């Protein structure tokens, strides 16, 4: 996607509404956003109003890639550090 933030890389470790909204705006402006989710069901917002992948979740997480990492494990932490190294500060 092209935009004013094209070439910017963002690693998003947020849930529910406000964090994903910020990531959505960055992605809409062209940033490459990777949403990090836990392996125990991911972002609780996925299940908002009882569904899976409801309209709100899809809207707030559009234009993003998702990566599932278990941040309780050493391997998950290493993967996060590796992913973060490629992100902009």
Task: Enumerate the language-model features and the residues they cover.
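N-terminal helix-loop segment corresponding to the beta1-alpha1 unit
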Residues: 1-84
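A short, hydrophobic C-terminal helix/tail in secreted or cell-surface proteins
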Residues: 85-89
């Amino acid at each position: 996607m092209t935009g004013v933030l094209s070439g910017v890389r963002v690693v998003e470790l947020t849930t529910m509404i406000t964090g994903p909204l910020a990531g959505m705006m960055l992605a809409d402006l062209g940033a490459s956003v990777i949403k990090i989710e836990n392996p125990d069901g991911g972002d609780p917002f996925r299940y908002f109003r009882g569904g899976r992948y409801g309209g709100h979740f899809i809207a707030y997480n559009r234009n993003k890639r998702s990566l599932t990492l278990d941040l309780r494990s050493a391997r998950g932490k290493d993967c996060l550090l590796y992913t973060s190294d490629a992100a902009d500060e």
